[in-house]
Amino acid sequence: MTVAEMERALESLGRQLANRGVSADIVMAGGAWMALVLGAREVTKDIDAYLAPPTGPVHQAIHAVAQALGLAEDGLNDGIKGFFFREPPQTLWREFLGLRVYAVSADYMLALKIYAARGSDTADAVTLIRHLGLRSVEEVLALVEQYVPERLLTVRHRYFAEGCLEEAGAS
């Protein structure tokens, strides 16, 4: 999805919700956050968002928007909820009729990327490390530990952070 497609999908979701007589709050993260909030990329495969309860009406509206705009059924999804270990720091990014879209903070976004530690997250993690001005693996891991339970962090996360720092030119 391009930035324009994501914005159109969110606006359409808000209209769908308003037409159903409901409003909703979502918290955006992932590639959509990198594109829409940070402006660090032009496209992403989907919009990852945490949906505030009740989610039933939101899921119905998402389905209607996906059909109307020809988007994949998971084009806007709440799969990220499994990575929210505590409520993330967030700010209102944009408000549409029927929909308020919040964005996680940059440090929370980096914590998610380091925790996921996927090769596909490297470029985003490098961008976030530079954006946040982090210079050491200790700084990165201390930030991650603010949001991810320490017991879930392994040496893999440290190595991923070290690799990202090196690529960012910070180590």
Describe the residue ranges of each PLM region.
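Compositionally biased terminal segments of proteins
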Residues: 1-171
